[in-house]
Amino acid sequence: MTYNNPVIPGFNPDPSIVRVGEDFYLITSTFEYFPGIPIYHSRDLIQWTLIGHALTRTSQLQVHTPEPGGGVWAPTIRYHGGIFYIMAASFQRYRPQQDDRVWPQGFYVKTMDIWNEETWSDPIFFDQVGFDQDVSFNFLDEDGTIYLSSTYRKIHPTPGDELKDFAIHICTVDLATGHSTSEPQLIRESLSGVAEGSHIIKRGRYWYLFTAEGGTEGGHSEWVHRSEVGPLGLWELGPNNPLWRNGVEDEVQNTGHADLVEDSKGNWWAVLLGVRPTRQGNTWEDSVLGNGRETFLVTLEWKNDWPVINGGQKISLISQGPGLYQFETTVAWRDDFSESRMQLGWYRKNTPFVNDYSLTERPGRLRLYGGPYNLSVPACPTMFLRKQIHRVCRWETKLSFHPISNQTEAGTVLWLNYFTYSSIGIRKDDQGRFIRFQPSEGDATEYRLNDQTDITLMIDCGTKYRFGYCAGTGDDVHWIGSVSNGAAMKVPPVGAIFIGMMTGLYALGERQRCLVPADFAYAEFK
């Protein structure tokens, strides 16, 4: 049966998956955004529902002023003895342009009730540094030993080559304390200079080591190794590495970072990341959705005790697998702010210091009290973001904002990072209120508002991003500017683009708090 890929569109990279009974649970990276690590649920591998996040409290996650691409990387989810475990790491400093990184200490959180996000524990930190942590519980069942694998730079660089030298290391750990109980050993390095995303499983008499190699851009690929001895190796390279290879001219690119799951019928599957660029004439345009890397699903078969993923073929947008079916995620989504808590799927940039919003002070409105940081500051602004998951759609909100200071603003934003964003909002000067459109490149433009009505703000998404507003019921849309998709995806001068495009709501003051609230009546994609 054929089905559509990606199965979880938009900014959802580095998938990790586990099955408990008939239920599948999948998690992805969140980088510098809060809450951290979304948890998706499915019973058929096709329709996935966001059911919560693993890191929702300041006692679990403190992400403050990291560069774009910092924060929480590539978590792994596992289940053992009635307990769900999630392993991850959080970069507080990430400046690859200067080869300046602080290797984070990994950690894990756990719960017995994955449906209640408040039950996840505070983190237990590992002694071992690195990223892409994985703990396999296969070995706990055999001799009580737990192995932790992670990625960091080799102690001794490769002589004569300018490589990243990111390699897979493994050590034993005391899970209760996180303390290492053995020295780490290097078990896999790559000629590309990057071996990461390690997952170790046991099947039959073999242990299998899966690694993502070549970096997460055009050279990305997935490799496999096996050992009859144990997780320390020796490791035998698979006969058909990489397990598949998508190139820079394919409809799906940058594929890799796979994790495996077996369904209740004995079928095996792999989830992995990929991007969907759009063809524009003779060139590819970076995907506003998939540059953040999306979650794909493909079949896995075992032949001669080696895994064969997707039949060894390239990953495509239409895939085949037993028992699956065609499904398209709907464009329409709306939040009327009618509940006492924010809907799942809203994100903050960084961990907020204070409570700067309310859903109860004015029922049926999201009330924001803008904090002292504008959107260009690395700190956490008063801003709520949602992932764009369809290339062609319209984002819309209705705003009531009557500022008393010339140094405050509220509106809606097209967001990539604090270097690259485009906003349309309400401000005031001595003559009254006006609309300001600030594109990601170029100068701001302003349009006078003649009355005190609520303002509808919108962003049309497609071949470009177009920004407009309506003043009052029945007013025509005033389209006041646009931003090319290329400009919206501009690479930052520091950090990296690991996320896809997001849209959001904000209120801000220039080094001061907004004393007047901004009230949003709704937010929607349509």
Regions found by a protein language model. Give the residues of each.
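Carbohydrate-active catalytic/glycan-binding domains of CAZyme proteins
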Residues: 1-526
